Amino acid sequence: MSDSPIQYRLIKKEKHTGARLGEIITPHGTFPTPMFMPVGTQATVKTQSPEELKQMGSGIILANTYHLWLRPGDELIARAGGLHKFMNWDQPILTDSGGFQVYSLADSRNITEEGVTFKNHLNGSKMFLSPEKAISIQNNLGSDIMMSFDECPQFYQPYDYVKKSIERTSRWAERGLKAHSRPHDQGLFGIVQGAGFEDLRRQSAQDLVSMDFPGYSIGGLAVGESHEEMNAVLDFTTPLLPENKPRYLMGVGAPDSLIDGVIRGVDMFDCVLPTRIARNGTCMTSEGRLVVKNAQFEEDFTPLDHNCDCYTCTNYTRAYIRHLLKADETFGLRLTSYHNLYFLVNLMKKVRQAIMDDNLLEFREDFMERYGYNRSNRNF
């Protein structure tokens, strides 16, 4: 697929790890990697405008196929001129396949070889999503990077179930490739599954690599397994993927997981974490997480993070942001969300510099110490 609309350019490998500095070229522009991608589930990153996302350095954002199919509908978005025009975002967009949401949100789902029947979580109506339909929806949305329809088995499901699941996912990937009507301007990624089983991850990767996708996603992680288990899966999975194509770790956004994913050769990450925890008043800072709603910040007239130069930290204090959140003012959610997104986008900028300087392991050690991962701060 050398004529693919998605191209990966390797700039530099880090001397001491599997990390790589590169860039991904898409029909709507080029972005540097490794990159964290903010999630815009409903064609908006919660509380943030496209201008703010550009200001903080988001080179690409993610939108959700399942949610946009249900509301407002992919055909309406196509009539609007596609997702880029609909949401006024002129940079790259990645869409997931809808598979994960079907398994995690939908009730009464029934998986067959043809696809998945499930109940619409908005109105209870019966819906059917197949590999072909997932591709058709994404073709209507017009994203730069699309995902194959896959089943995301739970990490601790039995071996026999996971084996059948990955074999079906490979067949679905092949069906999706055939159904893809816009290969000239949308790049379709295959998704490697296999839970924690090394041989099944290898089988899944080999199946998908043989289909020559323009890029590869690693799915089925950040679903309840330990950090060590995730790293172990990455250790044996990323080497199976082509060096000349992008590697995307789905649903991962905790700072330590981002750094450890990069060390193992991953280029792209996404997660709702920064905006989700921001709405509860939890902020990521260079010295660990800070719950700005707490009473101790009532008269704290300093920034959220003394080492951050984002819009929030440059202009507002902990006391003011705490007041906004306590008063249920939307502006408080905007400020905490902006800061958390900026924190992760900026973290990846620092990671890219550390790769350039060949000191990523030292950067990791320093970051982990400051952030407090040695103080039972596992989840953020």
UniProtKB/Swiss-Prot annotation:
Gene behind the chain: tgt
UniProt region (RNA binding), positions on chain: 251-257, 275-279
NCBIfam families: Q_tRNA_tgt, tgt_general
InterPro entries, alphabetized: ArchSynthase1/Queuine_TRR, TGT, TGT-like_sf, tRNA_ribo_trans-like
Binding site for substrate: D96, S97, G98, G99, F100, D150, Q193, G220
Record Gene3D superfamilies: Queuine tRNA-ribosyltransferase-like
Record: active site: D96 (proton acceptor), D270 (nucleophile)
EC assignment: 2.4.2.29
GO aspect biological process, one term: queuosine biosynthetic process
Residues involved in Zn(2+) binding: C308, C310, C313, H339
Cofactor(s) of this protein: Zn(2+)
Designated name of the protein: Queuine tRNA-ribosyltransferase
Cofactor remark: Binds 1 zinc ion per subunit.
Organism phylogeny: Bacteria, Bacillati, Bacillota, Bacilli, Lactobacillales
Any one GO molecular-function label of the UniProt entry: tRNA-guanosine(34) queuine transglycosylase activity
Keywords linked to the UniProt accession: Glycosyltransferase, Metal-binding, Queuosine biosynthesis, Transferase, tRNA processing, Zinc
Presence of the UniProt keyword Coiled coil in the record: no
Catalytic reaction(s) noted: 7-aminomethyl-7-carbaguanine + guanosine(34) in tRNA = 7-aminomethyl-7-carbaguanosine(34) in tRNA + guanine
Family membership: Belongs to the queuine tRNA-ribosyltransferase family.
Listed pathway(s): tRNA modification; tRNA-queuosine biosynthesis
Subunit structure: Homodimer. Within each dimer, one monomer is responsible for RNA recognition and catalysis, while the other monomer binds to the replacement base PreQ1.
Cross-referenced SUPFAM superfamilies: tRNA-guanine transglycosylase
Function: Catalyzes the base-exchange of a guanine (G) residue with the queuine precursor 7-aminomethyl-7-deazaguanine (PreQ1) at position 34 (anticodon wobble position) in tRNAs with GU(N) anticodons (tRNA-Asp, -Asn, -His and -Tyr). Catalysis occurs through a double-displacement mechanism. The nucleophile active site attacks the C1' of nucleotide 34 to detach the guanine base from the RNA, forming a covalent enzyme-RNA intermediate. The proton acceptor active site deprotonates the incoming PreQ1, allowing a nucleophilic attack on the C1' of the ribose to form the product.
GO cellular component, one term: cytosol
Xref: Pfam families: TGT
